[in-house]
């Protein structure tokens, strides 16, 4: 148990050490970051607290990093909360009253807030006021309490699940997209410099193009390649070493992993290529529906390997071609041996 806690602590330190401190260090999402820089600096120049910000998109693209950057840019504190933990007004009360003027209040997975807590947040966002109920029973009375002006930053992987009243209270909204291989390579160069990893550009590009357009995954794979090189290759990290390390994780040259392949082959082998419903697919693959929808499907759809129809999921011809190529490659490797 102690070892597990230690590993988790190391993972957290690893993530924090690589987090960009400002927008100039944040690679990718150029249109979004240009708008955000203008939005924040204009407010700072006027001596005002910036308006509330909402960032949405797939997991691992840097929404939490942007929340930290907002706080760093305005030079104030950051208070962090998670949507699922905010169910009732009392869950918000202590957090909101502890905020100092200009602080950033970051709510991750904001779409998972309880409805009652969400409605309690409306007046805090709009008027910097909340109502507190004093006493109970017939003598109960409501008192309005002023809050210090603050900026709320919300992050969500499912913007469609946000209510319209909540969404309308955000002055700035930014959709985060998957990163290009080139941007990920730049991110990995920065990460390798910070971590003291000696890897050539070709190796970093091999990692980048297998990272599903996601910086968090790219940095995790960089760490794995570092460990592999340390134990098997005398700390040498070139493209060949990167390929070997990633092959050990069963990640192909498109970034598809074991679950991706299983999902596609299940549809092909058992459901004639589809369509098949998401509930049936979840049982067949052994992954919960939310994980399939949030983690695996977006990338497969982006790559043109999977399509969603009104009748269910279907595999595309591109998927058939890719899986055949992977099979041929494995066969040729076996013949070489």
Swiss-Prot record:
Record-listed Mg(2+) binding positions: 64
Sequence segments annotated as region (Small ATPAse domain (RuvB-S)): 180-250
A GO molecular-function descriptor: ATP binding
Listed Pfam families: AAA_lid_4, RuvB_C, RuvB_N
List of residues binding ATP: 18-19, 60, 63-65, 126-128, 169, 179, 216
Subcellular location: Cytoplasm
Record family assignment: Belongs to the RuvB family.
Protein name: Holliday junction branch migration complex subunit RuvB
Organism: Chlamydia caviae (strain ATCC VR-813 / DSM 19441 / 03DC25 / GPIC)
Gene behind the chain: ruvB
């Amino acid at each position: 148990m102690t070892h597990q806690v230690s590993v988790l602590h190391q993972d957290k330190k690893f993530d924090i050490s690589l987090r960009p401190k400002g927008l100039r260090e944040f690679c990718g999402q150029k249109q979004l970051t240009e708008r955000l820089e203008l939005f924040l600096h204009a407010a700072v120049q006027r001596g005002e607290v910036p308006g509330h910000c909402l960032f949405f998109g797939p997991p691992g693209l840097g929404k939490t990093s942007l929340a930290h950057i907002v706080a760093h840019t305005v030079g104030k504190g950051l208070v962090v909360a998670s949507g699922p933990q905010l169910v009732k007004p009392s869950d918000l009360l202590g957090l909101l009253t502890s905020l100092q003027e200009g602080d950033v209040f970051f709510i991750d997975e904001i779409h998972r807030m309880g409805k009652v807590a969400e409605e309690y947040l409306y007046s805090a966002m709009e008027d910097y006021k909340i109502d507190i109920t004093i006493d109970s029973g017939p003598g109960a009375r409501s008192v309005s309490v002023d809050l210090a002006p603050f900026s709320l930053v919300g992050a969500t992987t499912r913007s469609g699940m946000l209510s319209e009243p909540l969404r309308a209270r955000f002055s700035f909204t930014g959709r985060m997209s998957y990163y290009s291989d080139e941007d990920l390579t730049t991110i990995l160069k920065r990460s390798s410099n910070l971590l003291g990893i000696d890897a050539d550009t070709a190796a970093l590009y091999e990692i980048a193009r297998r990272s599903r357009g996601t910086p968090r995954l790219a940095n995790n794979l960089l760490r794995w390649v570092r460990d592999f090189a340390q134990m098997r290759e005398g700390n040498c990290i070139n493209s060949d070493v990167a390929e070997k390390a990633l092959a050990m994780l069963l990640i192909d040259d498109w970034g598809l992993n074991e679950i991706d392949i299983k999902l596609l082959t299940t549809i092909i082998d058992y459901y004639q290529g589809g369509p098949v419903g998401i509930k049936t697919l979840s049982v067949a693959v052994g992954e919960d529906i939310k994980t399939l929808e949030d983690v695996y499907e977006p990338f497969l759809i982006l790559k043109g390997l999977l399509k969603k129809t009104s009748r269910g999921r279907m595999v595309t011809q591109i998927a058939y071609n890719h899986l055949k190529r992977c099979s041929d490659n494995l066969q040729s490797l076996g013949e070489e041996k």
